[in-house]
Amino acid sequence: MCIRDRSWQGTALVVDISGDISANVGMPNKIIFDPTAKDCVPYDVFASIDAAPDESERQERLEQLAYLLLPDKANDSEAGIFFAKNGRKMITAALICYYGMGWGFVEICEYFLGHDWRSLLNDIAQQKNKIANMYISSFVGASEQNTAGCKQAADDALKLFATNDKIKNALRKTASYEPSISPATLETNSIYIYIPDEKLKIYGDLLRIITAQSMEYFSSRPKEHTQMILFCLDEFASFGKLQITEALRKLRKRHIRIMVLTQSLADLDMIYGKDERKAMLGNFKFTVLLGCKDTETQEYFSKMIGD
């Protein structure tokens, strides 16, 4: 990988499955984010929200976080789309309400899962946060069965962050004098996210949050920041749906280089659909093919190369 080359002068955000990459890279200012370790330097989910210049921008970023937590799924059923859309409204209302009260991310997730939909919505309403209440006003008089389905969709999206002790430790709220990491850390340090191979499915939601927030940071990165940042995503299909195609089109101007590693096109098709996968591959300057077994993938790359 190019990050082993001493000529590389920038930093890197690397998803390092099983720790094979970080063990072989001697970059200075390297931070290993290991959510399985007790002494893990925590990742600050709310860093970009804290840095928002005004209340309106803060609200938008909280709404975007809700979308990252409960994204749309390709080829989802009509019922699935409904539950996800309205489950996001519940999450957004909770984030806006309880963030405004000074709660941490893990604390909000724990409270959300610890209450049924009626208790949760009543408590949010009682806080009299005008914006938060706008997101839940549509549930007044709605079918209780549908509302329960929306809450269940939201619960499933937040469960990892509310019930897994290792993840809760890795995302814990810190005092102002304690160290933590966020996408802005990449301006001075490289971050290697170590995920054991056997934990990849379990921690997939965590990876999606970190990588998606990093892309958001990159998209608004000040133009005077010219140091290169390598964005390396191993086992890419494990992240769920990211706005990667748009990032490939725009982030080069922000001095970001993206490297995506995946085992098959079929994995990408399941998440993004064929059309977006084709658009994605069309925006990579270089494609390295190490091997493929299924006929469709062989035909695709054969035509790309020119038979």
Predicted features along the sequence, with ranges:
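Conserved ATP-driven motor cores of ASCE-family P-loop NTPases powering translocation/secretion/packaging/pilus
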Residues: 248-250, 254-307
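P-loop NTPase motor domains
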Residues: 3-257, 272-274, 293
